[in-house]
Every structure is written in C-alpha cells, then in structure tokens.
Amino acid sequence: RIKLLIVGSPFFGRTQQSPFLRKLEQQAETLGDRVRFTGYVPNDSMPEYYRLADLVCVPTLVEEAAGLVAVEAMGCGRPVLATRSGGMPEYLDGSQAVLVDRDGNVAGQLSFAIRMLYEHPDLRAQMSTAGAKTAQRYSSARFYDDFVRIVYDFGGHLWNSPSSV
C-alpha cells in the first residue's frame, strides 16, 4: 500500500495554512492513515524526511527556478518524480528522475508514475544511485570550487594559485 507524507508548509517558516492546503487536508481525511501532513519542517531536518521516503515527488505547478528540493532528495539517495518546470529539467536530466508535463492531466501522470515506480523497486534503486552522483555536481563545495576557479581564471595574474584566494 502506498502512503503519502506531505512535508512542509505553503509559507516558509510559518504554521498558517493556505486555502489549497485546507482543501487538500479535507480530501485526505477520506484516505485515513495513507496521507499525513507534517506542516513546516526546518531545513536542517529535511534529510531525515528524505530518507524516510522510497520516492520524493516534487509536483510544482509554477516555474521552479532551482529545484533544490529535488537536488537535496537526490543527495540523500532518493529517486525523484517531478513536473517539467523551470530549471527542473536541467537538474533532472538523466536516469535519476521521472519528469511529467504540467498539463491538464498532471495528477494522472503523477499517479501513473508513482504506481510504476512502486511496482519496480529495481528501477528506484537505479534512480537512487544515479541521483546521488548527479547531486554531487550541485554541492556547495562544488559551487565554491567552481567560483574560485572562475575568479582565478578571470584575474589569475593577480594571484599565484587558486589556493591563495
């Protein structure tokens, strides 16, 4: 049986609810313990929630610029199911994720993909491995190293080596 844990809140760091969330909670009541809501979760606690999941679903309906939730989930070794939005296809460009279109049937596509991944644990395992490797490209250490390298390349005549920066 598939269970759904909805993590987070519509307003970062706040406990207030949106009309959408209230409606979602009302609909979920009919499903009993199959759907749970955590409310707001601090960022430093998120890895615990990612590791609870067999799959992390990021069904954004807006243009998601960075898709950090997807990158964080991959970093925790979780396969990702997301909507094709903003920068998401750039981050999720390979075998680590399933992307669905944001069209009139997004709920149907998500449902199909969740069931398909539920029924194929071997595919989830492959996606997890690929995702963990992909997430390394987006680590803060990697961004720092790339930034230092760019600064050094741009103004290299000012320093002897990147380590002197």
Predicted regions and their residues:
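A short hydrophobic beta-strand element within the catalytic core of glycosyltransferases
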Residues: 56-58
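Nucleotide-activated donor-binding/catalytic signature segment of Leloir-type glycosyltransferases, i.e.
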Residues: 8, 17-40
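A short alpha->beta transition loop at the rim of the catalytic pocket in nucleotide-sugar-dependent
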Residues: 54, 77
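Short alpha-helical donor nucleotide-sugar binding micro-motif in glycosyltransferases
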Residues: 40, 49-53
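A short, well-ordered alpha-helix in the C-terminal region of glycosyltransferases
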Residues: 116, 123-137, 149
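C-terminal alpha-helical cap of glycosyltransferases
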Residues: 140-165
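Short hydrophobic beta-strand element within catalytic cores of glycosyltransferases
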Residues: 79-82, 99
